[in-house]
Amino acid sequence: MRSDYCGTLRSEHIGKTVSLYGWIDGWRDHGGVIFLDLRDYTGIVQIVADPQRTPESYHLASSLRNEYVVRVEGRVSARPEHSLNPRLSTGTVEVYADTLAVLNRAETPPFAISKDEEVDEKLRLKFRYLDLRRGRMQKLLRLRHRVMQIMRRHLDERGFTEIETPVLVKSTPEGARDYLVPSRVNPGDWFALPQSPQLFKQLLMVAGFDRYYQIARCFRDEDLRADRQPEFTQLDMEMSFLSMEEIIALNEGLVAAILQETMGLELSLPLPRLTYAEAMVRYGSDKPDTRFGLELVEVSEVFRESSFQVLSGAVAAGGKVVCLPVPGAEGITNTRVKPGGDLFEFVTQFGARGLLFARVREGGQVDTIGAFSKSLTPEIAAGMIEKTGAQPGHLLLFGAGDRTAVPTVLDYMGRLRLKMGEELGLIDPNRHNLLWVTDFPMFEWNAEEKRLEALHHPFTAPRPEDEHDLKTARALAYDIIWNGVEVGGGSLRIYRRALQERVFETIGLTEEEARAKFGFLLDAFEYGTPPHGGIAYGFDRFVMLIAGEQSIREVIAFPKTQRAQDLMLGAPSAVAERQLKELNVRSTLPPKTQG
Protein backbone atom coordinates (compact mmCIF):
# COMPACT_ATOMS: atom_id res chain seq x y z
CA MET A 1 0.00 0.00 0.00
CA ARG A 2 1.38 3.40 -0.96
CA SER A 3 2.36 5.59 1.99
CA ASP A 4 3.64 8.67 0.14
CA TYR A 5 4.01 10.20 -3.30
CA CYS A 6 7.47 10.49 -4.80
CA GLY A 7 7.58 14.27 -5.13
CA THR A 8 6.33 14.97 -1.61
CA LEU A 9 9.29 13.65 0.40
CA ARG A 10 11.28 16.29 2.31
CA SER A 11 13.86 16.53 5.08
CA GLU A 12 11.14 16.14 7.71
CA HIS A 13 10.53 12.60 6.41
CA ILE A 14 14.09 11.45 7.21
CA GLY A 15 13.93 8.19 9.14
CA LYS A 16 10.45 7.31 7.90
CA THR A 17 9.87 3.97 6.17
CA VAL A 18 7.88 4.61 2.99
CA SER A 19 6.15 2.63 0.29
CA LEU A 20 6.37 4.27 -3.15
CA TYR A 21 5.01 3.44 -6.60
CA GLY A 22 6.00 4.90 -9.94
CA TRP A 23 7.97 4.75 -13.18
CA ILE A 24 11.72 4.54 -13.61
CA ASP A 25 12.81 7.93 -14.94
CA GLY A 26 16.57 7.32 -14.94
CA TRP A 27 19.20 4.74 -13.96
CA ARG A 28 22.84 5.23 -12.92
CA ASP A 29 25.53 2.85 -11.62
CA HIS A 30 28.07 4.75 -9.52
CA GLY A 31 30.84 2.58 -8.11
CA GLY A 32 28.73 -0.46 -7.49
CA VAL A 33 25.74 1.42 -6.08
CA ILE A 34 22.73 1.89 -8.37
CA PHE A 35 20.75 5.13 -8.25
CA LEU A 36 17.22 5.13 -9.64
CA ASP A 37 15.00 8.13 -10.32
CA LEU A 38 11.45 7.13 -9.41
CA ARG A 39 8.69 9.31 -10.89
CA ASP A 40 5.01 9.74 -10.28
CA TYR A 41 2.77 12.69 -11.07
CA THR A 42 4.07 14.68 -8.07
CA GLY A 43 7.73 14.54 -9.04
CA ILE A 44 10.91 12.48 -8.76
CA VAL A 45 12.78 11.00 -5.81
CA GLN A 46 16.16 9.25 -5.85
CA ILE A 47 16.21 5.55 -4.89
CA VAL A 48 19.46 3.93 -3.75
CA ALA A 49 20.07 0.21 -4.30
CA ASP A 50 23.14 -0.73 -2.23
CA PRO A 51 24.44 -4.32 -2.58
CA GLN A 52 25.88 -4.15 0.94
CA ARG A 53 22.45 -3.49 2.45
CA THR A 54 19.99 -5.31 0.18
CA PRO A 55 21.64 -7.58 -2.42
CA GLU A 56 18.25 -8.65 -3.82
CA SER A 57 17.14 -5.09 -4.51
CA TYR A 58 20.51 -4.27 -6.06
CA HIS A 59 20.34 -7.29 -8.35
CA LEU A 60 16.82 -6.40 -9.50
CA ALA A 61 17.73 -2.72 -9.92
CA SER A 62 20.49 -3.66 -12.34
CA SER A 63 17.86 -5.10 -14.70
CA LEU A 64 15.52 -2.10 -14.68
CA ARG A 65 15.01 0.23 -17.63
CA ASN A 66 13.25 3.54 -18.13
CA GLU A 67 9.44 3.44 -17.79
CA TYR A 68 9.36 0.15 -15.88
CA VAL A 69 6.62 0.34 -13.24
CA VAL A 70 7.94 -0.53 -9.79
CA ARG A 71 7.16 -0.59 -6.08
CA VAL A 72 9.84 0.50 -3.61
CA GLU A 73 9.87 0.16 0.15
CA GLY A 74 12.64 1.68 2.21
CA ARG A 75 13.83 4.31 4.64
CA VAL A 76 14.13 8.00 3.80
CA SER A 77 17.68 9.25 4.37
CA ALA A 78 19.47 12.58 4.07
CA ARG A 79 21.53 12.95 0.93
CA PRO A 80 25.26 13.44 1.40
CA GLU A 81 26.16 17.09 0.95
CA HIS A 82 27.98 16.43 -2.33
CA SER A 83 24.84 14.89 -3.88
CA LEU A 84 22.25 17.52 -2.92
CA ASN A 85 20.12 18.43 -5.95
CA PRO A 86 18.45 21.87 -5.77
CA ARG A 87 16.68 21.21 -9.09
CA LEU A 88 14.44 18.62 -7.42
CA SER A 89 11.86 19.35 -4.74
CA THR A 90 13.10 16.11 -3.11
CA GLY A 91 16.75 17.01 -3.65
CA THR A 92 17.72 16.86 0.04
CA VAL A 93 16.65 13.24 0.55
CA GLU A 94 16.89 9.77 -0.97
CA VAL A 95 15.28 6.41 -0.23
CA TYR A 96 17.33 3.27 0.40
CA ALA A 97 15.48 0.38 -1.25
CA ASP A 98 14.84 -2.43 1.24
CA THR A 99 12.45 -4.14 -1.16
CA LEU A 100 11.98 -3.56 -4.87
CA ALA A 101 9.34 -5.14 -7.10
CA VAL A 102 8.67 -4.83 -10.82
CA LEU A 103 4.94 -4.40 -11.47
CA ASN A 104 5.29 -4.09 -15.24
CA ARG A 105 7.99 -3.85 -17.88
CA ALA A 106 8.06 -1.34 -20.74
CA GLU A 107 9.24 -1.26 -24.33
CA THR A 108 11.50 1.61 -25.33
CA PRO A 109 9.12 4.57 -25.90
CA PRO A 110 9.08 6.27 -29.34
CA PHE A 111 10.18 9.50 -27.64
CA ALA A 112 11.73 10.45 -24.32
CA ILE A 113 9.23 10.74 -21.50
CA SER A 114 11.52 12.46 -19.02
CA LYS A 115 12.90 15.13 -21.37
CA ASP A 116 10.95 18.24 -22.32
CA GLU A 117 11.99 18.20 -25.96
CA GLU A 118 10.25 18.88 -29.25
CA VAL A 119 8.46 15.82 -30.63
CA ASP A 120 6.56 15.60 -33.91
CA GLU A 121 2.89 16.25 -33.10
CA LYS A 122 1.62 13.32 -35.14
CA LEU A 123 3.86 10.98 -33.15
CA ARG A 124 2.67 12.56 -29.91
CA LEU A 125 -0.98 12.09 -30.87
CA LYS A 126 -0.47 8.50 -32.01
CA PHE A 127 1.09 7.66 -28.63
CA ARG A 128 -0.96 10.15 -26.64
CA TYR A 129 -0.99 7.94 -23.53
CA LEU A 130 2.81 8.30 -23.44
CA ASP A 131 2.73 11.99 -24.31
CA LEU A 132 0.39 12.56 -21.37
CA ARG A 133 2.88 10.84 -19.08
CA ARG A 134 5.34 13.69 -19.67
CA GLY A 135 5.63 16.30 -16.93
CA ARG A 136 4.56 19.21 -19.12
CA MET A 137 1.33 17.53 -20.21
CA GLN A 138 0.58 16.43 -16.66
CA LYS A 139 0.82 20.06 -15.54
CA LEU A 140 -1.41 21.29 -18.38
CA LEU A 141 -4.22 18.83 -17.73
CA ARG A 142 -4.06 19.39 -13.99
CA LEU A 143 -4.29 23.12 -14.69
CA ARG A 144 -7.41 22.39 -16.76
CA HIS A 145 -8.88 20.52 -13.79
CA ARG A 146 -8.03 23.38 -11.45
CA VAL A 147 -9.72 25.97 -13.68
CA MET A 148 -12.82 23.76 -13.79
CA GLN A 149 -12.82 23.52 -9.99
CA ILE A 150 -12.56 27.30 -9.59
CA MET A 151 -15.44 27.84 -12.02
CA ARG A 152 -17.67 25.36 -10.23
CA ARG A 153 -16.87 26.71 -6.78
CA HIS A 154 -17.39 30.34 -7.82
CA LEU A 155 -20.76 29.65 -9.45
CA ASP A 156 -21.97 27.31 -6.70
CA GLU A 157 -21.30 30.06 -4.15
CA ARG A 158 -23.51 32.42 -6.17
CA GLY A 159 -26.58 30.24 -6.34
CA PHE A 160 -26.06 28.53 -9.69
CA THR A 161 -27.32 24.99 -10.32
CA GLU A 162 -25.31 22.64 -12.53
CA ILE A 163 -27.67 20.81 -14.90
CA GLU A 164 -26.79 18.43 -17.72
CA THR A 165 -28.59 18.76 -21.04
CA PRO A 166 -29.04 16.13 -23.79
CA VAL A 167 -26.34 15.13 -26.25
CA LEU A 168 -28.76 13.61 -28.77
CA VAL A 169 -30.81 16.55 -30.03
CA LYS A 170 -32.78 17.85 -32.99
CA SER A 171 -30.86 19.15 -36.00
CA THR A 172 -31.49 22.88 -36.45
CA PRO A 173 -28.52 23.92 -38.61
CA GLU A 174 -27.73 27.62 -38.38
CA GLY A 175 -24.07 28.25 -39.14
CA ALA A 176 -21.72 25.30 -38.69
CA ARG A 177 -22.69 21.82 -39.87
CA ASP A 178 -24.19 19.37 -37.42
CA TYR A 179 -22.80 15.95 -36.65
CA LEU A 180 -25.71 13.62 -37.44
CA VAL A 181 -26.59 10.33 -35.71
CA PRO A 182 -29.05 7.92 -37.40
CA SER A 183 -31.84 6.56 -35.23
CA ARG A 184 -32.10 2.76 -35.41
CA VAL A 185 -35.46 2.61 -33.67
CA ASN A 186 -36.92 5.40 -35.82
CA PRO A 187 -35.74 4.46 -39.34
CA GLY A 188 -35.04 7.45 -41.57
CA ASP A 189 -34.84 9.90 -38.67
CA TRP A 190 -31.70 11.47 -37.29
CA PHE A 191 -30.39 13.02 -34.13
CA ALA A 192 -27.74 15.75 -34.13
CA LEU A 193 -24.96 16.25 -31.62
CA PRO A 194 -25.39 19.68 -29.98
CA GLN A 195 -23.38 22.66 -31.18
CA SER A 196 -24.28 24.27 -27.86
CA PRO A 197 -26.91 23.81 -25.14
CA GLN A 198 -28.46 27.14 -26.19
CA LEU A 199 -32.12 26.17 -26.46
CA PHE A 200 -32.06 23.85 -23.46
CA LYS A 201 -30.62 26.51 -21.18
CA GLN A 202 -33.28 28.97 -22.29
CA LEU A 203 -35.94 26.35 -21.55
CA LEU A 204 -34.39 25.88 -18.09
CA MET A 205 -35.04 29.58 -17.50
CA VAL A 206 -38.65 29.05 -18.60
CA ALA A 207 -38.70 26.21 -16.04
CA GLY A 208 -37.70 28.62 -13.28
CA PHE A 209 -34.18 27.45 -12.41
CA ASP A 210 -33.02 31.10 -12.36
CA ARG A 211 -29.26 30.44 -12.49
CA TYR A 212 -27.86 27.52 -14.49
CA TYR A 213 -24.43 26.41 -15.53
CA GLN A 214 -22.93 23.39 -17.22
CA ILE A 215 -19.50 22.31 -18.38
CA ALA A 216 -20.82 21.05 -21.68
CA ARG A 217 -19.47 18.99 -24.53
CA CYS A 218 -20.28 20.56 -27.91
CA PHE A 219 -19.80 19.35 -31.49
CA ARG A 220 -19.35 21.21 -34.77
CA ASP A 221 -18.50 19.71 -38.14
CA GLU A 222 -16.35 22.54 -39.45
CA ASP A 223 -12.89 23.15 -40.85
CA LEU A 224 -10.31 23.13 -38.08
CA ARG A 225 -7.79 25.75 -37.00
CA ALA A 226 -5.34 25.98 -34.12
CA ASP A 227 -8.16 27.00 -31.78
CA ARG A 228 -10.91 24.69 -33.06
CA GLN A 229 -11.82 21.04 -32.52
CA PRO A 230 -14.80 19.02 -33.78
CA GLU A 231 -15.68 18.31 -30.14
CA PHE A 232 -14.94 20.90 -27.51
CA THR A 233 -15.92 22.05 -24.04
CA GLN A 234 -17.89 25.12 -23.02
CA LEU A 235 -18.65 26.68 -19.69
CA ASP A 236 -22.30 27.47 -20.36
CA MET A 237 -24.33 29.83 -18.16
CA GLU A 238 -27.82 31.33 -18.16
CA MET A 239 -29.52 33.70 -15.70
CA SER A 240 -33.04 35.09 -15.26
CA PHE A 241 -34.06 38.61 -14.25
CA LEU A 242 -30.56 40.11 -14.61
CA SER A 243 -29.65 43.11 -16.74
CA MET A 244 -26.77 43.05 -19.18
CA GLU A 245 -24.72 45.11 -16.73
CA GLU A 246 -25.35 42.60 -13.94
CA ILE A 247 -24.39 39.65 -16.14
CA ILE A 248 -21.19 41.37 -17.23
CA ALA A 249 -20.27 42.25 -13.64
CA LEU A 250 -20.89 38.68 -12.47
CA ASN A 251 -18.69 37.32 -15.24
CA GLU A 252 -15.92 39.82 -14.57
CA GLY A 253 -15.81 38.49 -11.02
CA LEU A 254 -15.59 34.92 -12.30
CA VAL A 255 -12.77 35.65 -14.75
CA ALA A 256 -10.88 37.72 -12.19
CA ALA A 257 -11.06 34.88 -9.66
CA ILE A 258 -9.77 32.34 -12.17
CA LEU A 259 -6.84 34.47 -13.34
CA GLN A 260 -5.89 35.46 -9.81
CA GLU A 261 -5.84 31.86 -8.55
CA THR A 262 -4.08 30.35 -11.57
CA MET A 263 -1.76 33.14 -12.74
CA GLY A 264 -1.56 35.55 -9.82
CA LEU A 265 -2.97 38.15 -12.21
CA GLU A 266 -4.98 40.96 -10.61
CA LEU A 267 -7.51 42.37 -13.05
CA SER A 268 -8.60 45.98 -12.77
CA LEU A 269 -12.41 45.92 -12.84
CA PRO A 270 -14.60 46.89 -14.52
CA LEU A 271 -12.95 45.80 -17.76
CA PRO A 272 -12.70 48.28 -20.64
CA ARG A 273 -15.40 48.18 -23.32
CA LEU A 274 -15.58 48.89 -27.01
CA THR A 275 -18.63 48.83 -29.21
CA TYR A 276 -18.45 46.62 -32.27
CA ALA A 277 -18.33 49.72 -34.47
CA GLU A 278 -15.44 51.22 -32.47
CA ALA A 279 -13.50 47.96 -32.53
CA MET A 280 -13.84 47.58 -36.28
CA VAL A 281 -12.94 51.20 -37.07
CA ARG A 282 -9.93 51.35 -34.74
CA TYR A 283 -8.60 47.79 -34.94
CA GLY A 284 -10.24 46.16 -37.96
CA SER A 285 -11.46 43.32 -35.75
CA ASP A 286 -14.34 42.49 -33.44
CA LYS A 287 -11.81 40.76 -31.18
CA PRO A 288 -9.08 43.42 -30.99
CA ASP A 289 -5.66 42.84 -29.51
CA THR A 290 -5.14 46.04 -27.52
CA ARG A 291 -1.69 45.22 -26.16
CA PHE A 292 -0.23 47.59 -28.75
CA GLY A 293 -1.30 50.74 -30.56
CA LEU A 294 -0.95 50.84 -34.34
CA GLU A 295 -4.61 51.78 -34.72
CA LEU A 296 -6.32 52.22 -38.06
CA VAL A 297 -7.23 55.76 -39.11
CA GLU A 298 -10.01 56.65 -41.51
CA VAL A 299 -8.73 59.19 -44.06
CA SER A 300 -11.70 59.27 -46.43
CA GLU A 301 -12.11 63.04 -46.28
CA VAL A 302 -8.45 63.57 -47.15
CA PHE A 303 -8.99 61.81 -50.48
CA ARG A 304 -12.55 62.89 -51.29
CA GLU A 305 -11.35 65.33 -54.00
CA SER A 306 -8.27 63.34 -55.02
CA SER A 307 -7.57 62.81 -58.71
CA PHE A 308 -6.64 59.22 -57.84
CA GLN A 309 -9.91 57.51 -58.71
CA VAL A 310 -9.21 54.36 -56.70
CA LEU A 311 -9.52 56.38 -53.49
CA SER A 312 -11.88 59.22 -54.38
CA GLY A 313 -14.16 56.75 -56.17
CA ALA A 314 -14.42 54.60 -53.05
CA VAL A 315 -15.43 57.65 -51.00
CA ALA A 316 -17.94 58.78 -53.63
CA ALA A 317 -19.52 55.31 -53.53
CA GLY A 318 -20.17 55.62 -49.81
CA GLY A 319 -17.09 53.67 -48.85
CA LYS A 320 -13.98 54.35 -46.83
CA VAL A 321 -10.25 54.90 -47.18
CA VAL A 322 -8.43 53.39 -44.21
CA CYS A 323 -4.79 53.99 -43.28
CA LEU A 324 -2.46 51.93 -41.10
CA PRO A 325 0.40 54.22 -39.97
CA VAL A 326 3.43 52.02 -39.19
CA PRO A 327 6.24 53.75 -37.26
CA GLY A 328 9.92 52.81 -37.58
CA ALA A 329 9.26 51.10 -40.89
CA GLU A 330 12.46 52.04 -42.73
CA GLY A 331 13.37 48.36 -42.92
CA ILE A 332 10.16 47.45 -44.77
CA THR A 333 11.10 47.68 -48.44
CA ASN A 334 8.85 48.86 -51.25
CA THR A 335 9.24 45.44 -52.85
CA ARG A 336 7.31 43.85 -50.00
CA VAL A 337 4.36 46.19 -50.48
CA LYS A 338 4.21 46.17 -54.27
CA PRO A 339 2.40 43.44 -56.29
CA GLY A 340 4.19 40.15 -55.75
CA GLY A 341 5.56 41.21 -52.37
CA ASP A 342 4.65 39.30 -49.23
CA LEU A 343 2.60 42.11 -47.65
CA PHE A 344 0.69 42.68 -50.88
CA GLU A 345 -0.03 38.97 -51.21
CA PHE A 346 -1.00 38.78 -47.54
CA VAL A 347 -3.87 41.26 -47.86
CA THR A 348 -5.08 39.95 -51.22
CA GLN A 349 -5.79 36.54 -49.69
CA PHE A 350 -8.33 38.29 -47.45
CA GLY A 351 -10.10 40.12 -50.27
CA ALA A 352 -7.93 43.18 -50.96
CA ARG A 353 -7.62 44.27 -54.57
CA GLY A 354 -4.34 45.99 -53.84
CA LEU A 355 -2.27 47.77 -51.22
CA LEU A 356 -1.26 51.41 -51.56
CA PHE A 357 1.55 52.92 -49.55
CA ALA A 358 3.39 56.16 -48.89
CA ARG A 359 6.41 57.07 -46.78
CA VAL A 360 7.01 60.08 -44.55
CA ARG A 361 10.54 61.44 -44.94
CA GLU A 362 12.57 63.95 -42.94
CA GLY A 363 11.01 67.40 -43.09
CA GLY A 364 7.52 65.95 -43.47
CA GLN A 365 7.86 65.13 -47.16
CA VAL A 366 5.56 62.33 -48.32
CA ASP A 367 6.44 60.18 -51.30
CA THR A 368 5.10 57.11 -53.02
CA ILE A 369 5.19 55.52 -56.49
CA GLY A 370 3.07 55.12 -59.59
CA ALA A 371 -0.27 56.79 -60.23
CA PHE A 372 -0.75 57.40 -56.52
CA SER A 373 2.36 59.58 -56.59
CA LYS A 374 0.97 61.81 -59.34
CA SER A 375 -2.17 62.56 -57.31
CA LEU A 376 -0.32 63.32 -54.09
CA THR A 377 -0.73 67.10 -53.85
CA PRO A 378 0.84 69.10 -50.98
CA GLU A 379 -2.65 69.55 -49.51
CA ILE A 380 -3.37 65.81 -49.53
CA ALA A 381 0.08 65.02 -48.11
CA ALA A 382 -0.45 67.54 -45.30
CA GLY A 383 -3.92 66.11 -44.64
CA MET A 384 -2.52 62.59 -44.38
CA ILE A 385 0.09 63.65 -41.84
CA GLU A 386 -2.38 65.69 -39.81
CA LYS A 387 -4.99 62.93 -39.72
CA THR A 388 -2.60 60.06 -38.91
CA GLY A 389 -0.06 61.91 -36.77
CA ALA A 390 2.67 60.31 -38.87
CA GLN A 391 6.31 61.22 -38.24
CA PRO A 392 9.45 60.75 -40.36
CA GLY A 393 10.05 57.02 -40.75
CA HIS A 394 6.36 56.13 -40.88
CA LEU A 395 5.07 53.82 -43.60
CA LEU A 396 1.44 54.58 -44.44
CA LEU A 397 -0.50 51.59 -45.76
CA PHE A 398 -3.91 52.15 -47.35
CA GLY A 399 -6.99 50.07 -48.03
CA ALA A 400 -10.13 51.32 -49.75
CA GLY A 401 -13.48 50.09 -50.99
CA ASP A 402 -17.05 51.14 -51.68
CA ARG A 403 -19.87 50.79 -49.17
CA THR A 404 -20.33 47.05 -49.70
CA ALA A 405 -16.58 46.41 -49.43
CA VAL A 406 -16.00 48.32 -46.17
CA PRO A 407 -16.24 45.20 -43.93
CA THR A 408 -13.65 43.47 -46.12
CA VAL A 409 -11.35 46.51 -46.07
CA LEU A 410 -11.50 46.78 -42.29
CA ASP A 411 -10.89 43.04 -41.95
CA TYR A 412 -7.76 42.84 -44.09
CA MET A 413 -6.37 46.07 -42.65
CA GLY A 414 -6.94 44.67 -39.16
CA ARG A 415 -5.09 41.50 -40.08
CA LEU A 416 -2.28 43.61 -41.53
CA ARG A 417 -2.15 45.54 -38.25
CA LEU A 418 -1.59 42.30 -36.32
CA LYS A 419 1.06 41.15 -38.77
CA MET A 420 2.95 44.43 -38.48
CA GLY A 421 2.64 44.40 -34.69
CA GLU A 422 4.18 40.93 -34.52
CA GLU A 423 6.91 41.70 -37.06
CA LEU A 424 7.97 44.93 -35.34
CA GLY A 425 7.94 43.37 -31.87
CA LEU A 426 5.22 45.69 -30.60
CA ILE A 427 3.24 42.95 -28.80
CA ASP A 428 4.32 42.27 -25.23
CA PRO A 429 3.72 38.54 -24.62
CA ASN A 430 3.68 39.13 -20.86
CA ARG A 431 0.86 41.66 -21.03
CA HIS A 432 -2.77 40.62 -20.54
CA ASN A 433 -5.47 42.91 -21.92
CA LEU A 434 -9.08 41.87 -21.43
CA LEU A 435 -12.08 43.86 -22.62
CA TRP A 436 -15.71 43.55 -23.66
CA VAL A 437 -17.01 44.19 -27.16
CA THR A 438 -20.70 45.13 -27.22
CA ASP A 439 -23.44 46.38 -29.55
CA PHE A 440 -22.87 43.88 -32.34
CA PRO A 441 -25.14 44.02 -35.37
CA MET A 442 -28.03 41.58 -35.06
CA PHE A 443 -27.46 40.31 -38.60
CA GLU A 444 -24.88 40.08 -41.35
CA TRP A 445 -25.37 39.56 -45.07
CA ASN A 446 -24.70 36.09 -46.47
CA ALA A 447 -23.70 36.87 -50.06
CA GLU A 448 -23.67 33.20 -51.08
CA GLU A 449 -27.23 32.54 -49.91
CA LYS A 450 -28.35 36.14 -50.57
CA ARG A 451 -30.02 36.56 -47.20
CA LEU A 452 -29.45 37.98 -43.76
CA GLU A 453 -28.22 35.61 -41.07
CA ALA A 454 -27.78 36.05 -37.34
CA LEU A 455 -24.31 37.32 -36.46
CA HIS A 456 -24.36 35.33 -33.21
CA HIS A 457 -27.57 33.26 -33.16
CA PRO A 458 -31.23 34.07 -33.83
CA PHE A 459 -32.19 34.03 -30.12
CA THR A 460 -30.24 37.21 -29.30
CA ALA A 461 -32.37 40.17 -28.25
CA PRO A 462 -32.07 43.50 -30.08
CA ARG A 463 -31.59 46.79 -28.28
CA PRO A 464 -35.14 48.01 -27.47
CA GLU A 465 -34.64 51.28 -29.33
CA ASP A 466 -33.73 49.32 -32.49
CA GLU A 467 -36.68 46.89 -32.52
CA HIS A 468 -38.57 48.93 -35.12
CA ASP A 469 -36.02 47.96 -37.82
CA LEU A 470 -34.50 44.58 -37.05
CA LYS A 471 -32.40 44.50 -40.22
CA THR A 472 -30.18 47.30 -38.90
CA ALA A 473 -30.65 46.61 -35.19
CA ARG A 474 -27.85 46.31 -32.67
CA ALA A 475 -27.85 43.26 -30.43
CA LEU A 476 -27.76 43.14 -26.65
CA ALA A 477 -24.68 40.97 -27.06
CA TYR A 478 -21.27 40.99 -25.40
CA ASP A 479 -18.03 39.15 -26.12
CA ILE A 480 -15.09 38.99 -23.73
CA ILE A 481 -11.73 39.31 -25.51
CA TRP A 482 -8.32 38.38 -24.15
CA ASN A 483 -5.27 39.53 -26.14
CA GLY A 484 -7.18 39.37 -29.40
CA VAL A 485 -8.87 36.03 -28.70
CA GLU A 486 -12.58 35.68 -28.05
CA VAL A 487 -12.85 33.55 -24.91
CA GLY A 488 -16.55 34.00 -24.27
CA GLY A 489 -19.67 35.44 -25.77
CA GLY A 490 -23.24 35.96 -24.69
CA SER A 491 -26.34 38.08 -24.91
CA LEU A 492 -29.71 38.87 -23.50
CA ARG A 493 -32.25 36.58 -25.13
CA ILE A 494 -35.56 37.10 -26.83
CA TYR A 495 -38.31 35.95 -24.47
CA ARG A 496 -41.45 37.12 -26.31
CA ARG A 497 -42.93 34.98 -29.07
CA ALA A 498 -43.85 37.82 -31.42
CA LEU A 499 -40.32 39.22 -31.45
CA GLN A 500 -38.81 35.77 -31.93
CA GLU A 501 -41.08 35.16 -34.92
CA ARG A 502 -40.01 38.50 -36.42
CA VAL A 503 -36.35 37.50 -36.10
CA PHE A 504 -37.01 34.14 -37.77
CA GLU A 505 -38.76 35.99 -40.60
CA THR A 506 -35.82 38.39 -40.94
CA ILE A 507 -33.36 35.51 -41.51
CA GLY A 508 -35.63 34.03 -44.17
CA LEU A 509 -37.46 31.31 -42.27
CA THR A 510 -41.06 30.81 -43.32
CA GLU A 511 -43.69 30.36 -40.64
CA GLU A 512 -43.78 26.64 -41.43
CA GLU A 513 -39.98 26.30 -41.23
CA ALA A 514 -39.87 28.18 -37.93
CA ARG A 515 -42.59 25.93 -36.54
CA ALA A 516 -40.83 22.75 -37.72
CA LYS A 517 -37.44 23.76 -36.29
CA PHE A 518 -38.31 25.79 -33.22
CA GLY A 519 -41.98 25.21 -32.46
CA PHE A 520 -41.18 23.90 -28.99
CA LEU A 521 -39.40 27.17 -28.13
CA LEU A 522 -42.17 29.35 -29.51
CA ASP A 523 -44.72 27.35 -27.53
CA ALA A 524 -42.64 27.73 -24.36
CA PHE A 525 -42.75 31.51 -24.77
CA GLU A 526 -46.53 31.29 -24.24
CA TYR A 527 -46.13 30.12 -20.63
CA GLY A 528 -44.57 32.98 -18.72
CA THR A 529 -40.98 33.15 -19.94
CA PRO A 530 -38.81 35.40 -17.75
CA PRO A 531 -36.30 37.91 -19.16
CA HIS A 532 -33.01 36.07 -19.29
CA GLY A 533 -29.51 36.07 -20.72
CA GLY A 534 -26.27 34.20 -20.52
CA ILE A 535 -22.82 33.52 -21.82
CA ALA A 536 -20.66 30.62 -22.96
CA TYR A 537 -16.89 30.37 -22.61
CA GLY A 538 -14.68 28.35 -24.91
CA PHE A 539 -13.20 26.40 -22.03
CA ASP A 540 -10.36 24.80 -24.01
CA ARG A 541 -9.33 28.17 -25.43
CA PHE A 542 -9.52 29.82 -22.02
CA VAL A 543 -7.23 27.22 -20.45
CA MET A 544 -4.87 27.49 -23.45
CA LEU A 545 -4.42 31.22 -22.79
CA ILE A 546 -3.91 30.72 -19.06
CA ALA A 547 -1.23 28.12 -19.85
CA GLY A 548 0.44 30.33 -22.47
CA GLU A 549 0.01 27.69 -25.18
CA GLN A 550 -0.62 28.26 -28.88
CA SER A 551 -3.08 25.42 -29.59
CA ILE A 552 -6.01 24.00 -27.67
CA ARG A 553 -4.73 20.53 -28.55
CA GLU A 554 -2.15 21.07 -25.79
CA VAL A 555 -4.83 21.32 -23.09
CA ILE A 556 -7.16 18.53 -24.28
CA ALA A 557 -6.40 14.99 -23.17
CA PHE A 558 -7.24 13.25 -26.45
CA PRO A 559 -7.63 15.85 -29.23
CA LYS A 560 -8.27 15.37 -32.91
CA THR A 561 -5.87 16.53 -35.62
CA GLN A 562 -6.64 19.40 -37.97
CA ARG A 563 -8.15 16.76 -40.27
CA ALA A 564 -10.54 15.77 -37.46
CA GLN A 565 -8.80 12.43 -36.96
CA ASP A 566 -7.82 10.52 -33.83
CA LEU A 567 -4.42 9.06 -34.72
CA MET A 568 -4.31 6.89 -31.61
CA LEU A 569 -7.67 5.18 -32.20
CA GLY A 570 -7.57 5.34 -35.97
CA ALA A 571 -10.89 7.19 -36.00
CA PRO A 572 -12.98 7.90 -37.94
CA SER A 573 -12.98 4.46 -39.53
CA ALA A 574 -15.08 2.26 -41.77
CA VAL A 575 -17.80 0.19 -40.13
CA ALA A 576 -19.25 -3.17 -41.08
CA GLU A 577 -22.00 -3.29 -43.69
CA ARG A 578 -24.14 -5.08 -41.10
CA GLN A 579 -23.99 -2.04 -38.82
CA LEU A 580 -25.10 0.26 -41.63
CA LYS A 581 -28.02 -2.02 -42.47
CA GLU A 582 -29.18 -1.97 -38.84
CA LEU A 583 -29.29 1.82 -39.10
CA ASN A 584 -30.99 1.80 -42.51
CA VAL A 585 -28.01 3.70 -43.92
CA ARG A 586 -26.26 3.01 -47.20
CA SER A 587 -22.87 4.35 -48.28
CA THR A 588 -22.55 5.72 -51.80
CA LEU A 589 -18.74 5.56 -51.72
CA PRO A 590 -16.89 2.76 -53.50
CA PRO A 591 -15.79 0.15 -50.93
CA LYS A 592 -12.06 0.93 -51.33
CA THR A 593 -12.50 4.60 -50.44
CA GLN A 594 -14.82 4.22 -47.48
CA GLY A 595 -13.41 5.59 -44.26
Swiss-Prot record:
Localization annotation: Cytoplasm
CDD domains for the chain: AspRS_core, EcAspRS_like_N
PROSITE patterns in alphabetical order: AA_TRNA_LIGASE_II (PS50862)
Keyword set, alphabetical order: Aminoacyl-tRNA synthetase, ATP-binding, Cytoplasm, Ligase, Nucleotide-binding, Protein biosynthesis
SUPFAM superfamilies to which the protein is assigned, alphabetical: Class II aaRS and biotin synthetases, GAD domain-like, Nucleic acid-binding proteins
NCBIfam families referenced in this protein's UniProt entry, alphabetically: aspS_bact, PRK00476.1
Sites annotated Important for tRNA non-discrimination: H30
Catalytic activity: tRNA(Asx) + L-aspartate + ATP = L-aspartyl-tRNA(Asx) + AMP + diphosphate
Family from the record: Belongs to the class-II aminoacyl-tRNA synthetase family. Type 1 subfamily.
A GO term from the CC aspect: cytoplasm
Region Aspartate: start-end pairs: 198-201
Sequence positions that bind L-aspartate: E174, R220, H456, R493
PANTHER family: ASPARTATE--TRNA LIGASE, MITOCHONDRIAL, ASPARTYL/LYSYL-TRNA SYNTHETASE
Residues that, per the record, bind ATP: R220, D221, E222, Q229, E486, G538, F539, D540, R541
Any one GO biological process: aspartyl-tRNA aminoacylation
Record-level Gene Ontology MF annotations: aspartate-tRNA ligase activity; aspartate-tRNA(Asn) ligase activity; ATP binding; nucleic acid binding
Pfam families in the cross-refs: GAD (PF02938), tRNA-synt_2 (PF00152), tRNA_anti-codon (PF01336)
InterPro entries documented for this protein: Aa-tRNA-synt_II, aa-tRNA-synth_II, aa-tRNA-synth_II/BPL/LPL, Asp-tRNA-ligase_1, Asp-tRNA-ligase_1_N, Asp/Asn-tRNA-synth_IIb, AspRS_core, GAD-like_sf
Segments forming a coiled coil: none
EC numbers, comma separated: 6.1.1.23
Main location: cytoplasm
Top-level division of the source organism's lineage: Bacteria
Function: Aspartyl-tRNA synthetase with relaxed tRNA specificity since it is able to aspartylate not only its cognate tRNA(Asp) but also tRNA(Asn). Reaction proceeds in two steps: L-aspartate is first activated by ATP to form Asp-AMP and then transferred to the acceptor end of tRNA(Asp/Asn).
The protein's name: Aspartate--tRNA(Asp/Asn) ligase
Known partners and oligomeric status: Homodimer.
